Regions:
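Helix-to-loop junctions at the C-terminal end of transmembrane segments
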Residues: 65-77, 258-269, 353-354
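A late C-terminal transmembrane helix in Major Facilitator Superfamily
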Residues: 324-356
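Helix-breaking motifs and short loop linkers at transmembrane-helix boundaries and internal kinks
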Residues: 45, 77, 99-104, 133, ...
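Cytoplasmic helix-loop-helix junction between adjacent transmembrane helices
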Residues: 110-146
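C-terminal transmembrane helical hairpin of 12-TM major facilitator-type secondary transporters
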Residues: 271-317
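Extracytoplasmic gate region of multi-pass secondary transporters
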Residues: 33-34, 207-255
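Helix-loop-helix hairpin linking two adjacent transmembrane segments in secondary transporters
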Residues: 134, 142-187
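C-terminal ends and interior cores of transmembrane alpha-helices
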Residues: 88-101, 280-292
Length: 384
């Protein structure tokens, strides 16, 4: 195992702890937009389709960048610099959004913000899987806990700041964690320099493409659901604070689901986890939008748990397919393709909601989860 990335962090466990903290802040930013949207829709008089375009601005180009940055980091070993630039982009984008006075300026601000989404996952996965070669699923599950804490804290923090302050002050305050994480990681993390004497060939296998598309279908489903969940709940009669609490509960359950997903991966393989997660999410959303008098929060939580359980598994499977060569490219490919696919569904969902209603738009998302269920049977089996 290469230990060059442990120069400042002298054990794999400490490395995992530092990157889990980084994952917390990274994924806090990844789910911030949905909880800003209700206020942005009112402030800028946006349609649901225009709101969906903001999601495209944060995701499409970042999806293209992920495999490119992953491959560049594989060649240069400059993983630390890539990660730091990502957190800086999050903060700069939020500050720019605070100064935006038009829709075009808002799209540009969230484009900058979205660049931050292209940097962290591939680099942190390479660090962690090289440090934990025999327990990748468990390590990535623990790493996922940080992301889940960031996820479920985002609705509470974002909605609380918007209620307590004006939109501009709220986004300025939300930019602070990114700056603090740049300082923290600059001090604690060292670049990983490859020990390989020869550069491995650039290869994208059929297994990797299947994994990227399958994860992309799940992320398409989840991204659209998450982006419009607060709006859906507010239309159903919830206040902004209540919608934030329900979304936070869903993301808290996702916090519990990620290490469970990693455990299932290590024991039974990613194929089983992907199949079970996608069919469960589809059924739960059908029940949620059926109009039956059932506790909606439970089915919302089940949807969140099913989708987020696949996140650490997709990372672990991507690194396994790479088998030590071009891990950054492999993981960047999985998250990049998935991110690009997912970037279009919020706008599509918003367009359908403009034509019909949000309930109909949500119901149609089950097609994506069912497609992921069918494709999951072609994924690689348990790694031995």
């Amino acid at each position: 195992m290469s230990t060059s990335h442990l120069k400042k962090i002298n054990t794999p466990e400490k490395l995992l702890g530092v990157l889990t903290a980084g994952h917390l802040v990274n994924d806090f930013y990844n789910v911030t937009l949905p909880f800003l949207l209700p206020t942005l829709i009112i402030t800028f008089d946006l349609s649901f389709f225009q709101a969906g375009i903001l999601s495209i601005a944060t995701s499409l180009f970042s999806g293209l960048l992920q495999p490119v940055l992953g491959y560049a980091a594989d060649r240069s070993g400059k993983r630390k610099a890539v990660i730091l630039c990502g957190f800086l982009a999050f903060s700069v984008g939020l500050v720019a959004a605070g100064f935006a006075t038009s829709y075009i300026m808002l799209v540009a601000a969230f484009f900058i913000f979205g660049l931050g989404k292209s940097t962290f996952h591939a680099q942190s996965t390479n660090f962690i899987t090289s440090a934990f070669p025999t327990s990748r699923g468990r390590a990535m599950g623990i790493h996922g806990i940080g992301g889940s804490i960031g996820n479920f804290s985002a609705p509470i923090i974002a909605t609380s700041l918007i209620v307590a302050f004006a939109l501009r002050e709220a986004v300025f305050l939300m930019a602070i964690p990114g700056i603090l994480m740049v300082i923290f990681l600059a001090w604690t993390l060292s670049d990983q320099v490859s020990n390989q004497k020869q550069t491995p060939p650039l290869m994208i296998s059929r297994k990797l493409i299947l994994l990227a598309i399958n994860f992309g279908l799940i992320l398409m489903f989840y991204e659209a659901f998450l982006v419009f969940l607060p709006t859906f709940l507010i239309e159903a009669g919830s206040s902004l604070s209540e919608a934030g609490f329900i979304a936070a509960f869903m993301l808290f359950v996702g916090f519990l689901a990620q290490p469970v997903g990693g455990y299932i991966h290590d024991r039974m393989g990613g194929k089983v986890l992907f199949a079970a997660s996608s069919i469960t999410a589809a059924v739960a959303l059908l029940v949620l939008t059926s109009g039956w008098d059932l506790p909606a929060i439970l089915f919302i939580a089940l949807i969140g748990a099913s989708a987020t359980a696949t996140f650490p598994v997709a990372l672990a499977m991507g690194s396994e397919i790479a088998d030590g060569a071009n891990v950054g490219l492999s993981v960047g490919m999985v998250f990049g393709v998935a991110g690009m696919l997912a970037s279009v569904t919020p706008a599509m969902t918003g367009y359908i909601a403009d034509l019909f209603d949000m309930q109909t738009a949500f119901r149609l998302l089950t097609v994506l989860a069912l497609a992921a269920f069918g494709l999951s049977f072609f994924l690689p089996g348990k790694s031995t």
